[in-house]
């Protein structure tokens, strides 16, 4: 197994805002390589427990090795399974805290075989759960031009969505699009580079969201947070693009108006300059925290 690394973001802020009981039960809904979990366990007591969820089997195994702490229970499922898992583990009353870090792990981005980045020339895959049915190749080779335009516009906020979709449909007439580099080359003439940002970035984001139903998963889970948390328990959600942040902001706001939660931070929390300097991938992170009433 490769020795991948991933630097967790906003750790100090998470530690300060999520922990309400040092011997409580916490959920890391996006375990990844275990960076946030390892940091939190360093602050928690001996009786604390963290239940970590990740759809990526390799991530779960690497997290277990990286954390190496009996207080972690790592589960190879989506965080949507949290209500059932709490019940199965006979945890009464709910969790003291839930953390979601909705960013892509560095090891997933840097592993060309996963197909998340146009940099490595790997297969067009993009599945978090490699046992899942639909890949990014399935999307680009089977969706109509109208369907591609819709996901590029809605999930990637790509202003040239129609041109990008048309370029893909033209190219796949000759042969199936199979690799990330093939797709990036097809898009290059119609999606020029935006400063330091590759022109295909938003299309790749849109494909990843479509393949993994990311926005639907986030929305469904945030709505059931009151079932997962005990009174006084907190949910901390880190987002990396405006679509996710808008969903979290609006649902927290609605829950607050209905008296289910109170907002711990009324204004979004972003990384300090020093963190961004040391970890460039943290620059777009935004943290929102709510507490169950």
Swiss-Prot record:
Domain of life: Bacteria
Catalytic activity: cytidine(1402) in 16S rRNA + S-adenosyl-L-methionine = N(4)-methylcytidine(1402) in 16S rRNA + S-adenosyl-L-homocysteine + H(+)
UniProt-listed Enzyme Commission number(s): 2.1.1.199
Transmembrane segments annotated in the record for this chain: none
Coiled coil: none
UniProt-listed InterPro entries: RsmH, SAM-dep_MeTrfase_MraW_recog, SAM-dependent_MTases_sf
Places the protein is found: Cytoplasm
GO molecular function terms listed in the Swiss-Prot or TrEMBL record: rRNA (cytosine-N4-)-methyltransferase activity
Binding residues annotated for S-adenosyl-L-methionine, in chain numbering: 34-36, 54, 86, 101, 108
Keywords from the named record: Cytoplasm, Methyltransferase, rRNA processing, S-adenosyl-L-methionine, Transferase
Keyword Magnesium in annotation: no
Top enzyme class: transferase
Function: Specifically methylates the N4 position of cytidine in position 1402 (C1402) of 16S rRNA.
Family: Belongs to the methyltransferase superfamily. RsmH family.
PANTHER family (UniProt xref): 12S RRNA N4-METHYLCYTIDINE METHYLTRANSFERASE, S-ADENOSYL-METHYLTRANSFERASE MRAW
Protein's recorded name: Ribosomal RNA small subunit methyltransferase H
The gene coding this protein: rsmH
């Amino acid at each position: 197994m490769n020795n991948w690394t991933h630097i967790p973001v906003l750790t100090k802020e998470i530690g300060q805002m999520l922990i309400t009981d040092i011997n409580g039960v916490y959920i890391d809904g996006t375990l990844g390589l275990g960076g946030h979990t390892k940091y939190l366990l360093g602050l928690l007591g001996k009786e604390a427990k963290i239940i970590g969820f990740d759809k990526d089997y390799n991530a779960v195994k690497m997290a277990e090795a990286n954390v190496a702490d009996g207080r972690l229970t790592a589960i190879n499922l989506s965080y949507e399974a949290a209500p059932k898992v709490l019940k199965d583990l006979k945890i009464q009353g709910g969790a003291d805290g839930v953390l979601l870090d909705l960013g892509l792990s560095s090891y997933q981005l840097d592993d060309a075989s996963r197909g998340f980045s146009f940099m490595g020339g790997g297969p067009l895959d993009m599945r978090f759960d490699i046992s899942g049915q639909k890949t990014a190749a399935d999307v680009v080779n089977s969706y109509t031009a109208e369907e591609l335009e819709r996901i590029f516009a809605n999930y990637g906020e790509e202003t040239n969505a129609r041109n990008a979709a048309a370029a893909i449909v033209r190219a796949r007439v000759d042969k199936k699009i199979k690799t990330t580099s093939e797709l990036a080359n097809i898009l290059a003439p119609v999606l020029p580079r935006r400063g330091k940002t590759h022109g295909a970035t938003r299309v790749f984001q849109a494909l990843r969201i479509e393949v993994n139903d990311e926005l639907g998963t986030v929305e469904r889970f945030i709505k059931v947070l009151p079932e997962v948390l005990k009174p006084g328990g907190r949910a901390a959600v880190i987002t990396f693009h405006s679509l996710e942040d808008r969903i979290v902001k609006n649902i927290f706001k609605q829950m607050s108006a209905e008296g289910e939660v109170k907002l711990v931070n009324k204004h979004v929390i972003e990384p300090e300059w020093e963190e961004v300097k040391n970890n460039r991938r943290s620059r777009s992170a935004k943290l929102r925290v709510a507490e169950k009433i």
